[in-house]
Curated annotation (Swiss-Prot):
Keyword Transit peptide among record annotations: yes
Transit peptide: 1-62
Gene: PSRP5
Region: Disordered, residue numbers: 123-142
CC per GO annotation: chloroplast thylakoid membrane; ribonucleoprotein complex; ribosome
Anything else known: Three different forms exist, PSRP-5 alpha, PSRP-5 beta and PSRP-5 gamma, due to different transit peptide cleavage.
Name used for this protein in its record: Large ribosomal subunit protein cL37 alpha
Protein task: Component of the chloroplast ribosome (chloro-ribosome), a dedicated translation machinery responsible for the synthesis of chloroplast genome-encoded proteins, including proteins of the transcription and translation machinery and components of the photosynthetic apparatus.
GO molecular function terms attached to this record: rRNA binding
InterPro entries, alphabetized: Ribosomal_cL37
Amino acid sequence: MALLSPLLSLSSVPPITSIAVSSSSFPIKLQNVSVALLPSFGQRLVAHGPVIAQKRGTVVAMVSAAAEETAGEDGDQSKVEEANISVQNLPLESKLQLKLEQKIKMKMAKKIRLRRNRLMRKRKLRKRGAWPPSKMKKLKNV
């Protein structure tokens, strides 16, 4: 059951509305979740249900304030512009993060490549009858 503490008012200072979710009908992971909503003048509040991020996971509640006007389109364009920034213009932490991600990708590619080679080698040995190695001991006396 959702409890609303202070009611929304149309004063110049937007009040903080918190929603505490605690009910026996929800799963244990979703009990006692609190979400703070900050309404601004001329906007309506939209609260989406909690989302479980992982199996063990944390509970994330997505809350968005949507105005009657279409102000969301400008935000989408700024996200696209942020993605197109070159590496030289990024701060040092972002550069290190990108280098680290690329290094991890290269390591994974190497592991996959080595595994593929190992499996091909096994396949060829099986075709010749030389795999598994324990079979070779049996074939010595033949």
